[in-house]
A protein has these predicted regions:
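Active-site nucleophile/metal-coordination loop of metallo-enzymes that catalyze phosphate/sulfate
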Residues: 2, 12-134
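Residue-level marker for buried hydrophobic side chains located in beta-strands
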Residues: 4-6
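Glycine-rich, mobile lid/loop segments that gate access to catalytic sites or pores
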Residues: 110-180
């Protein structure tokens, strides 16, 4: 038997005051989804020990134990763009972003975590330029889609304290720069 798994990733959203403090999903006309409400229950897909996110939840829904195999979103994204990783490789998401132009890089503000929804073609040119300037036997930059790219670190360090750019929109980036 074949199955189709449909994940409504991010569908819950946040309450919107203009919609009477309801979500877009609350006010949308969706008779088929509403019909499932009486048939389905709730499931915890993300273990309490892990931060909720689509990466962790998708692993669990597909039958993997995130507590045993989850090391971050980046290895999943690396594989999704065709990167063959070695056991000793560490994948790090490499986003193109838009920052303010303050002279001190630590005082710059994250204006846009998606570089203005940069096109994949423009982004490829930038990541290839970064690879030419910074890539070597240890660090390799790979173009992905739009603002989302990948850095593979050969024999890299794990357990880094990294903050996703979308978590710090409109904030000064200094305290969120990589640590360890």
């Amino acid at each position: 038997m074949k199955y189709i798994v449909i994940l409504g990733d991010g569908m819950a959203d946040k309450d919107i005051p203009e919609l009477g403090n309801k979500t877009i999903l609350d006010v949308a006309k969706k008779p088929h989804i509403d019909g499932l409400k009486g048939v389905l229950g709730m499931a915890r897909t993300v273990p309490k020990e892990l931060k909720p996110g689509s990466d962790v939840a998708n692993l669990a829904v597909m039958g993997y134990d995130p507590l045993k195999c989850y090391t971050g979103r980046s290895p999943l994204e690396a594989v999704s763009i065709g990167i063959n990783m070695k056991e000793t490789d560490v994948a790090i998401r490499c986003n193109l972003v838009t920052l303010s132009d303050d002279e001190d890089p630590k005082k710059r503000t994250m204006f846009d975590y998606s570089a203005g929804e940069i096109s994949s073609e423009e982004a490829r040119e930038l990541i290839e330029a970064v690879e030419r300037e910074l890539g070597d036997d240890e660090f390799k930059f790979y173009p992905g889609i739009s603002y989302r790219h990948c850095l593979i670190w050969d024999n890299g360090k794990t357990g880094l304290d990294l903050t996703p750019p979308h978590d710090i929109s409109d904030r000064v980036i200094g305290e969120y720069l990589p640590k360890n």
